[in-house]
């Protein structure tokens, strides 16, 4: 594991970046991006995920590639918010959106949903969930923000 003092400026900048790709496997141009620019982190979307076992294998592959090219373990991220913003397929654990959980009036439900999501993502090799988010519903016609 490398320290910041051992890194070049380009390598330090690469640690501040997260990159994603199309498809279930990283294409060659994505792997080249990691190698050339020392991209240190990965963001995954629904387009990258078939099921839990495939996601786990993908995360292991990505982790190995980034570690070999940068000397640093990456954050593998996703935004599994719940509700309409879910990245995991229906065969995996999915939770209601934040507005629906809040409507129950029980803070314990929010904790339980967060814990369940964290456990599911961790079991698949994801390190960092970019959720919850604090969306402001200032437009009632916005289809993304809602129950």
Ranges and model annotations:
Residues 2, 32, 119:
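Surface-exposed charge patches
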Residues 7, 30, 70-71:
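Generic detector of short alpha-helix boundary/capping microenvironments
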Residues 15, 27, 86-88:
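Active-site-proximal flexible loops/turns
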Residues 11, 25-38:
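N-terminal glycine-rich anion-binding loops that anchor highly charged ligand groups
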Residues 16, 20, 31-35, 56:
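N-terminal glycine-/serine-/threonine-rich phosphate-binding loop
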Residues 35-147:
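Enzymes and membrane/adaptor proteins characterized by extended Gly/Ser/Thr/Asp/Glu-rich
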Residues 1-25:
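Boundary/entry segment of secreted carbohydrate-active catalytic domains
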């Amino acid at each position: 594991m490398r320290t910041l003092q051992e890194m070049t400026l380009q390598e330090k900048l690469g640690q501040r970046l997260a990159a994603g790709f199309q498809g279930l496997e990283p294409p060659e141009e994505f792997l080249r991006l990691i190698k050339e620019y020392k991209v240190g982190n990965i963001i995954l979307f629904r387009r990258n995920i078939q099921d839990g076992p495939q996601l786990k294998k993908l995360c292991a592959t990505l982790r190995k590639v980034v570690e070999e090219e940068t000397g640093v373990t990456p954050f593998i991220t996703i935004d599994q918010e719940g509700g309409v913003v879910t990245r995991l397929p229906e065969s995996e654990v999915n939770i209601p959106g934040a507005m629906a959980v809040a409507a129950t009036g029980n803070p314990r439900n929010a904790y339980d949903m967060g814990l369940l999501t964290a456990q599911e993502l961790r079991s698949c090799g994801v390190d960092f969930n970019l959720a919850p988010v604090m969306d402001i519903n200032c437009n009632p016609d916005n289809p993304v923000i809602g129950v």
